[in-house]
Each structure stands twice: as C-alpha cells, then as structure tokens.
Amino acid sequence: MPSAIPRGLLLLAGLCCLVFGIMAEDAQVAQGPSQQIPRSLAHFAHSMYRVLTQQSNTSNIFFSPVSIATALAMVSVGAKGDTHTQILRGLEFNLTEIAEADIHNGFQNLLHTLNRPHSEHQLTTGNGLFLDQKLKLKEKFSEDVKTLYHAEAFPTNFSNPKEAEKQINAYVEKGTQGKIVDLVKDLSADTVLALVNYIFFRGKWEKPFDVKHTTQEDFHVDTSTTVKVPMMKREGKYKAFHCSTIQSWVLLLDYEGNVTALFLLPEEGKMQHLEETLTPELIFKFARKTERMFANVHLPKLSISGTYDLKEVLGHLGITNVFSDAADLSGVTEDIPLKISKGLHKALLTIDEKGTEAAGATMMEFMPMSLPEDLSFNKPFLFLIIDHSTDTPLFVGKVMDPTKK
C-alpha cells in the first residue's frame, strides 16, 4: 500500500531542479520535429519572460529556457492524462501538429547537438535522476529518460536529507564547473526522487574587448537612479541595426563557434514597448542578420543570476496538476503516487572582456570617415544567448541594474 504521507519529487533546472513527493492515498489521479523543438522553446521562453516581468518589472531577469524545458519534458515521459497534456501545452507544443514521440526524439537530437565537443567554446548539459534506494522506477520510464535524455541514475538515501543534499549539490557543482553551489537546501525527508538538469556555457568573444579600455561609467537604472559600472568599449564593424517595430537598437556579438549574444537596447522610455512588441519570430529574424555597420559599443561587465520557484512561474503557463495532489505520474513508478513538491531554477551569467588572440582580436577593420554609431548600453536592456546550430535560445535575460547580483 502506498504511504498516505505526501512525498516529493525535486526538479532542478539550469540549474533546474524538481522534487517529487508521494501524494495522499486518495489523490485523483507540420514542421519537422527538429525545427519544432527550437520554435516551441522560443515561444516557451517568451511566455516565461512575460510571467517574470509581470512579477517584477524592476529586477534583473536571467533564466535558461532549454534547461527548464528539458527537465519538464523528462517529467512528461512518466506523466499521464491532464498532467501530461498540461506539461506539453505549457512547453508550447501543439499536440495536433506534432506527435509526442517526435517531441522526445527532437529533444534527444537537440541535446546530442548541444553536447558535441567544440574547440571554440564549452557547452554542456546533463540530466541526473537521484532515486530513493527503496523506489523502483518503471522500466519504460527508466529506459526512455536514459536513451532520449541521456539521464544518469544515482541511488540516494533521502532518509538522510543532509547526505542527499550533499550528493545532489556535488553533481550540480561538478556539472557547472563550480558556478552553482549549495543549490539544494532544507531537503524534506519525504523526498523520494530528484530530477536535475544543468546547462553550462563558456564562450570567448570572436572580437574580444580590450581590458585597458574598460572604465567606470554611469548606468541609468531609471530616471532617478544612476550607478557606476565597469563599461567595456570597442569600436569596430558589428552586426547592428535599428528596428522601428520594437523601437530599439539590436546588436549581435558572436562568440567563437556557433553561439551569438543578441542585445536589445530600447529607445528612451520604450522598454515596455519593446517587451510588448518583441516576438520569437522577430528574434529568429534578428539572429540571421548579416549586414554590418561601424559602431562604438559600450557594454557593461555583468555578473547576474536568477533563482525562481517554478511552481509559481509555471502555474501561470497552465502547468498546475504536476505540483498538486491531482498529479498523475503513474508512468514513473507504481510504488507510490508522486507529485512535484518543489521546483527550482537557478542560472548565472558573467560577461567580461575575455577573448582569445584569434582572428577577431587581430583583424584589421577600416573605419569610414564619418563617425561610427554610438551604441551605449548604459540603461536597461534585454539579451538572449542563441545556439545557431540548433536555433535554440540557451539563455534569456533582462538587465535593470548591473550592480545587482
């Protein structure tokens, strides 16, 4: 007989983390797939960004849509009924247009591509299943998450929460190369399964900034608040242009390899307009721009992070059952009814001058006689980090105050 005590599943993403718990006994239970995954991820990122801005329009935002979506897609493998439908719809998949098998195969291909070794940059993802020693997973769920999501399984003694926390945090710290530490705290002894996804990216600018040119400058948080920030500077030929639709300047800074940072600088007082008019379709269009212009770029050094309660955020996207006693995760295990008792997402970003002494650093750029356009990111702006090989939004952010971690 299943225990009548609610138990939890912990979900950690980007780190993204979901905690699964046992429920009470009486709980109620067109495009090709390879193109559909990035498109759906872009729409999911857009929806999640809007939820986060509604919660606070004065805070920095930073999250990894691909990390959160991967963790949820893994959960959907074992979900049934409305729980299953809510997850896939919340991830912006139209189940009348794409088969579920194609969704999971699409994630498999995406993860395989993202994890290919690159000499130019580091981009790795990982999925871990931490199982209570007494919990027996269904064979199909176990095989599917290993095959499709390359998940590793680790036996865990959740009856000793401190040891379980230590084990999960060590996995996360290693996967993120020490960037995310002590993510899991106050773990409940009722937890029986933790599902962890992490993503780690380290890139070098194709055209690095010179440290000697970085100086302290003003950043205008709002009309009444100004802070001093280290501002990087570089004059040269950039993929940059003004878009009247969103009333913003768009700047693309390439990393070595297939990754690009896309920065969006709204005109004075037009941040809300930018947020209301920016669409995934425009982002894809911007990312493919190739024309260049001469510009004098001023970009603040950044070290920001985002930590989010996924239960609250995803609830606004219609994903509610999986966090409640209405959850049907009967495809995960027959031993006990599960629900996600806690969902955590943490992502960190550092942007600085670093680059290699490669073509970008030594490349000759002839300047026109006219003055270059001055693109100074000295006020709030948006940005995305996009993988071109898959058209996937790896990270999404909004900088309101670069001095806030």
UniProtKB/Swiss-Prot annotation:
Entry annotated with the keyword Kinase: no
Glycosylated residues, chain numbering: N57, N94, N157, N258
Alphabetized InterPro entries for the sequence: Serpin_CS (IPR023795), Serpin_dom (IPR023796), Serpin_fam (IPR000215), Serpin_sf (IPR036186), Serpin_sf_1 (IPR042178), Serpin_sf_2 (IPR042185)
Major subcellular site: secreted
Keyword list, A-Z: Acute phase, Glycoprotein, Protease inhibitor, Secreted, Serine protease inhibitor, Signal
Residue segments, region RCL: 360-379
Entry remark concerning the domains of this protein: The reactive center loop (RCL) extends out from the body of the protein and directs binding to the target protease. The protease cleaves the serpin at the reactive site within the RCL, establishing a covalent linkage between the carboxyl group of the serpin reactive site and the serine hydroxyl of the protease. The resulting inactive serpin-protease complex is highly stable.
Lineage: Eukaryota, Metazoa, Chordata, Craniata, Vertebrata
The family this protein is said to belong to: Belongs to the serpin family.
Job of this protein: Inhibits elastase, chymotrypsin, cathepsin G, plasmin, and trypsin.
One GO cellular component term: extracellular space
Protein's cellular compartments: Secreted
GO MF annotations, alphabetized: serine-type endopeptidase inhibitor activity
Name of this protein: Alpha-1-antiproteinase S
GO biological process: one example: acute-phase response
Site (Reactive bond): M369, S370
Signal peptide: 1-24
CDD domains named among the record's database cross-references: serpinA1_A1AT
Induction (record text): APS rose several hundred-fold during the acute phase reaction.
Keyword Transmembrane helix attached: no
